């Protein structure tokens, strides 16, 4: 499956406000990046959502700064634990809270990192490269970081950028 997405740094939205939005959901995510060939990103994820836990393995090959070919499958907890021993050297498990909501029929994902107090990362998938992203009025975009390697999840597992440089 080809995924086209855009990524932005935003001011952290008011938690109570976004919880009241249509189709809001919240999940705790732990991502671990694994050793792989250089053109491939290989990760496993533990996602806690509504009293359940789902484990997935994802292999992603970047096509360009906006799109990637992605293969994802659900795995067992045992497989997750076994694969986690192959963590890529120089990386750390990445923890974040993901809040999702729908606005004008479009799914928005806001990733909140414990290391940042005032900002978060917003991602949205697009149907095409030229699709224009319409933000809700309560989202304040600081800057777009689509294609900026410092803000890829794989890079953030090595070093989360200082919020002051945002």
Language model regions located:
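Phosphate-end processing signature that detects enzymes handling 5′-triphosphorylated RNA
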Residues: 1-166
């Amino acid at each position: 499956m080809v995924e086209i997405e855009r990524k932005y740094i935003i001011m952290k939205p008011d938690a109570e406000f976004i919880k009241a939005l249509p189709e809001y959901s919240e999940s705790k995510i732990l991502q671990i990046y694994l050793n792989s060939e250089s053109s491939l990103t290989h990760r496993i994820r533990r996602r806690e959502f509504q009293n359940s836990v789902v484990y997935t393995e994802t292999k992603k090959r970047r096509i360009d700064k906006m799109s990637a070919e992605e293969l994802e499958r659900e795995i067992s907890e045992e497989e997750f634990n076994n694969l986690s021993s192959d963590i890529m050297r120089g990386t750390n498990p990445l923890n974040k809270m993901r809040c999702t909501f729908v606005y004008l029929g479009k799914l928005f994902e806001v990733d909140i990192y414990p290391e940042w107090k005032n900002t978060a990362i917003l991602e949205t998938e697009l149907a095409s490269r030229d699709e224009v992203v319409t933000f809700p009025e309560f989202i304040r975009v600081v800057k777009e970081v689509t294609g900026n390697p410092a803000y890829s999840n794989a890079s953030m597992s090595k070093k989360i950028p200082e919020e002051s440089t945002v």
